[in-house]
Amino acid sequence: MQDDLQYAQEAASEPGLRSYYKEKVLQQEEGHMKRVEILNQRIVFDDVFKIEEATLRFERFNGQMSEPVRRLVFERGDAAAALLLNRDTQKVILIEQFRYPTYKKGPGWLLEVVAGMVDQGEQPEETIRREVREEVGYQVSDLQPIATFYVSPGGSSERIALYYAEVGEADRVAAGGGSAAEHEDIEQVELSLPELWTALRKGNIVDAKTLIAVQWLQCRLAGQQNVKGT
């Protein structure tokens, strides 16, 4: 939390960002949130996921309401993910698995951080603890929040809660490999930091949540180096 506060303070020290955040905070405190009018909405597809169609008007930046517009939302649910560091080997734990939506454009098999969908009534922390056990066989004790973000806000409501955690061989409680009921076939991949940076530089990591996690780790380690150097 202290790191997050420091980051926010540093970001807000930039003149442009400072005025932007100040305006947004004042709007929230005064209840001046922009208006949205939902004229009608309906579910047009309902299988594993849902697609919602809505007609709405929204407040434009000039204060006027827009004309009625049609929007589609892919309702996939929210997810949780975690970047794991093996404290015994000082290697980052990733997974590799087949992802059919990426098969046509490639590569099909992706390097990713551990992740899973948040079940109804479940908190993201519960989700990621379960997924870490299922996919790589570790029991996680401490979770450090990195960020919560929208995956593709132009068409999907899905958010991912991303965490960082350290594990060791003493935390291994299962074989991992994924859920047989979900027909998962997951291979655990451990990369040293130089190997991870090389994979990033060569474009071998193409999953967005994993890119965010790895770049966060780079910033975190760079910050630690700067502190040591002062």
Language-model features, listed with the residues they occupy:
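Alpha-helical and coiled-coil interaction segments, frequently adjacent to or embedded
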Residues: Y7, A12-K34, F45-D47
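Conserved Nudix-box catalytic region and its N-terminal flanking loop in Nudix hydrolases
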Residues: R18-Y20, R71-F74, K91-R130, R172, ...
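A short coil-to-beta-strand element that immediately follows conserved catalytic motifs
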Residues: E37, Q139-I146
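Acidic pyrophosphate-coordinating catalytic loop
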Residues: I43-D47, G63, Y103-K104, Y150-A161
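Acidic, metal-coordinating catalytic segment for phosphate/diphosphate chemistry
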Residues: V44-T89
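Conserved hydrophobic/aromatic beta-strand scaffold that supports enzyme active sites
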Residues: I51-E53, L83, L94, L162-Y164, ...
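Active-site-adjacent beta-strand/loop module that shapes the phosphate/pyrophosphate-binding cleft
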Residues: L56-F61, S152-A174
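NUDIX/MutT-family hydrolases
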Residues: G178-N204
